[in-house]
Amino acid sequence: MLTRRRFLTTSVTACGLLGLQACSGETDYAEAVARIWRHSATTLDDAAARTLELVRYATLAPSSHNTQCWKFRPGGDGISILPDFDRRCPVVDPDDHHLFVSLGCAAENLIQAAAAFGQHGEARFVSAAGGSVDIALTPATAQRSPLFEAIPNRQTTRGDFDGQPLDREELGLLAQAGRGEGVQLLLLTERQAMEAMLELVIQGNTAQIRDPAFIRELKTWIRFGEAEAVALGDGLFARSSGNPALPRWLGSRMFDLFFSEQAENDKYARQVRNSAGIAVFVSAVNDAAHWMAVGRAFERFALQATALGVRTAHLNQPVELPGLRAQVSDYLGLKPGRPDLVIRFGRGAEMPRALRRPVAAVIA
């Protein structure tokens, strides 16, 4: 019988001749991480350079499967963030909900960075022509907030947390950061409530893993090795989830053999139980404008968590399936309102980083 250990041992032996290439890939990956996940090295007095740097900070926001489903259009006294529908995920996100949440996350990063560069940003959702987030920028006194400082350190951390609770002050700061107009934030820290959400997460995860279309889409966005991650600059880097970096042909084969419903459900059960709590973001109205607002609120929450040394990760399975989403609403007593995001949080080790495409690739 082919076990995971035997497969890995055989595969590593077979790949021994690729050692030098792997070392090169690791070096390129480390250089890419250092180049992407950083603060600006100099003061930016040139308006054009400052605009590009604002876009760079915006791209450090999270997006579903790290698709980076956005385009940025500078113009006049502001920047518009447009959806890139070529990077949508039609299986896991058929109504483009996560896509517009991602635009909101990028908008919040841009506004936090603009304040640090001496500009006040005001975001407005425009529904015409597929929807966009228009950010007007006006001169202001430069102010580097803790949320801005946290941008290069924020990470969707797909590892275990330490199981320790947060104190009341920390929970209060997270609650304050996650508030938004038309957005409700629920913080679940009681074990009974977390177990109830875990049951819904496992139901959703099971349904998704049994869906071949979901698996095909997920696999499309996995970057199995450093060289692939660096070349494409997007997607879910295998090492970010605690898996080994492998050439795509080998990583793909390993995924097919060992990615299983039981293993994933066991992982989520362990990770919920070693989290300090679960955050649920709820939009008052189920439309793209409010999804964008949820993205902004979540990004503030994630940045505040980062500033506190707290990590976050998504548990969105129960809000990605309509039937389970209704069960989440019923359990939490959400009438009206759409549960948009389910986030676990707690303290834990940093994982290897996902990458980003160059700024030039996202300018419309």
Residue ranges and their predicted role:
Residues 2-364:
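Acidic, surface-exposed loops and disordered segments
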